[in-house]
UniProtKB/Swiss-Prot annotation:
The lineage of its organism: Bacteria, Pseudomonadati, Pseudomonadota, Gammaproteobacteria, Vibrionales. It is found in: Cell inner membrane. The keyword Ubl conjugation does not apply. It comes from Vibrio parahaemolyticus serotype O3:K6 (strain RIMD 2210633). GO terms for molecular function: ATP binding; ATP hydrolysis activity. Keywords: ATP-binding, Cell inner membrane, Cell membrane, Membrane, Nucleotide-binding, Translocase, Transport. This is Hemin import ATP-binding protein HmuV.
């Protein structure tokens, strides 16, 4: 079994009087893609933000066996990168310059930074936009650009690498959805990264993730492999939706279809 690199114990979170996360414990392992799933308002993005430290909390969270509080921000930034669901960047940077921001925690020359940024821009299919102004890009182009940025950030992470992606396919067309998740899976399998991704598409999650964590009303309902997690009974429990689950005709993963 792959070793645990991120763990959270008894995680709870309130917004006002609303309990958003209710006593969740979770382990994230190197070499695996873990998908956080659930309906709107289930707590997926909040859990991701708590795990990466974006939202301050007193919950017990460890990175690589050490408490979150023991890590200096400039050090954990070399090993943990977070792709947010939305970017608030409004300055007229060139697309290439946005990706180069990912190299801030790294020890690189200007030339090395640019070369690295262009490498990851090619990987995420935005190299042709390198000299374009960021505000002029489409939502999907911005999403792929920021993926290149967080990949750049983790370039010098060595054998300690956590990649967190919050709905990275939400603005993407079909081909780029699959390419993005192939990149995530490659990071896990080829680089032994721990990848955590928030998704809404159960079939994409089933195809690319090793583990599916299903949340409902702030509670962890299931943490298992796709075949065990995606049963018609559990899908109806979590989503209130009747479904049929079949095997993909050529690949070994379950597919979810409407029951009627």
């Amino acid at each position: 079994m792959n070793h645990v690199v991120l763990s959270g114990r008894n995680i709870s979170m309130k917004y006002g009087h609303r309990l958003v996360l209710d006593d969740i414990s979770i382990d994230i392992r190197a070499g695996e893609v873990t998908a956080l799933l659930g309906p709107n308002g289930a707590g997926k993005s909040t859990l991701l933000k708590l795990l990466c430290g974006e939202v301050p909390s007193h919950n017990e969270i460890d990175y690589f066996g050490e408490p979150k509080e023991a890590w200096k921000p400039e050090e954990i930034a070399k090993h943990l990168a977070m792709l947010p669901q939305h970017s608030t960047l409004t300055f007229p940077f060139l697309a290439r310059e946005v990706v180069e921001l990912g190299a801030i925690p790294l020890s690189l020359s200007n030339k090395e930074t640019t070369e690295l940024a262009l490498h990851y821009m090619q990987k995420t299919d935005v190299l042709h936009l390198a000299e374009s102004l960021y505000p002029a890009l489409s939502g999907g182009e911005k999403q792929r650009l920021h993926l290149a940025r967080v990949l750049t950030q983790l370039h010098q992470s060595g054998d300690k690498k956590i990649l967190m992606l919050d709905e990275p396919t939400s603005a993407l067309d079909l081909a780029h959805q699959h390419n993005t998740l192939k990149i995530a899976r490659e990071a896990a399998k080829a680089q032994n990264a721990a990848v955590v991704v928030v998704l809404h598409d159960l079939n994409l999650a089933s195809q690319y993730a090793d583990r599916l964590v299903l949340l409902h009303n702030g509670k962890l309902v299931c943490d298992d492999n796709p075949w065990q997690a995606l049963t018609p009974e559990r899908i109806e429990q979590v989503y209130g939706y009747r479904s049929i689950v079949t095997k993909h005709p050529t690949l070994d993963f379950p597919q979810v279809h409407a029951a009627a």
